[in-house]
């Protein structure tokens, strides 16, 4: 909004000229989302506590230390969604189609998560909305997004770029739409599975969003994309502002979500944040890089898949003491804070590996 209002005055005002730069607006987005989180956080937490008498239901079969979390409110992802969307609407170019498509997906996945959290709180159990129902809704939203990208782009690309290899890409044809849907839905659920400890998912999400802030900027810049031999996609640079807002809002949320958490992001936050990262990776044609940068999410999801299939195949045996993987280490006696910080370190390593793929070709 501010960008569009100030754009006509770029040549007449130094301040207006600053808004012409994506980097300036991205930095401002971090400041705004951080500030909004600090201001609205205590108010939202108090409000959620007044509505949720028992807070988020805690699994009885989980680590014993988790019973101290009883009564902690959920749906804190509302804080992240509101601050991120507001900063994007204020600072991004509102004529940019990618901004609106991404915000649509972000909010839509957030609504699915809210429905799930609401069901858990009202029923006072950790099951929420049926898994198949959630997958169906996620599939519908991701399909709408993929169709919009297909028909709004003048020359849609069905190429899957392979990182670390020069000029290596796979033409998936119209199967690319199915693949893109898988990326978006998979990313949403992967982040959801990772969000099981205080602050565990928040920082890796911030690292991933920060990585894609850089990727969006480079892919949307003709000079940089040519230099790095990346697929140039006009107008994706504006997604840098949105990604920066995600970084700020996640760091602001961490203030209240660090152990011992005052609030959980819930599925409202995890499904929406995972979904929006998947959408941005599809738009920027860096789907595989998302799997690298967000490697922690992939590992957590893989641990669940292996556990479930092995349990069924062996009729009751388990690979891990408990899945997702972070609970396995808790069952081994690791303190929650140690699991969280070590997983943060792993996510930093994955982010650096993913970003190195932009240059190593």
UniProtKB/Swiss-Prot annotation:
Domain of life of the native organism: Bacteria
Annotated protein name in UniProt: Phospho-N-acetylmuramoyl-pentapeptide-transferase
Pfam families on file: Glycos_transf_4
Membrane topology: Multi-pass membrane protein
GO cellular component: plasma membrane
One BP term from GO: cell division
Pathway recorded for this protein: Cell wall biogenesis; peptidoglycan biosynthesis
Function: Catalyzes the initial step of the lipid cycle reactions in the biosynthesis of the cell wall peptidoglycan: transfers peptidoglycan precursor phospho-MurNAc-pentapeptide from UDP-MurNAc-pentapeptide onto the lipid carrier undecaprenyl phosphate, yielding undecaprenyl-pyrophosphoryl-MurNAc-pentapeptide, known as lipid I.
Needed co-factor(s): Mg(2+)
Family indicated by similarity: Belongs to the glycosyltransferase 4 family. MraY subfamily.
Organism expressing this protein natively: Rickettsia montanensis
Class of the enzyme per the UniProt entry, highest EC level: transferase
PANTHER family: PHOSPHO-N-ACETYLMURAMOYL-PENTAPEPTIDE-TRANSFERASE, PHOSPHO-N-ACETYLMURAMOYL-PENTAPEPTIDE-TRANSFERASE HOMOLOG
The reaction(s) this protein catalyses: UDP-N-acetyl-alpha-D-muramoyl-L-alanyl-gamma-D-glutamyl-meso-2,6-diaminopimeloyl-D-alanyl-D-alanine + di-trans,octa-cis-undecaprenyl phosphate = di-trans,octa-cis-undecaprenyl diphospho-N-acetyl-alpha-D-muramoyl-L-alanyl-D-glutamyl-meso-2,6-diaminopimeloyl-D-alanyl-D-alanine + UMP
GO MF annotations in UniProt: metal ion binding; phospho-N-acetylmuramoyl-pentapeptide-transferase activity; UDP-N-acetylmuramoyl-L-alanyl-D-glutamyl-meso-2,6-diaminopimelyl-D-alanyl-D-alanine:undecaprenyl-phosphate transferase activity
InterPro entries in the record: Glycosyl_transferase_4, PNAcMuramoyl-5peptid_Trfase, PNAcMuramoyl-5peptid_Trfase_CS
Main location (coarse class): membrane
Encoding gene, per UniProt annotation: mraY
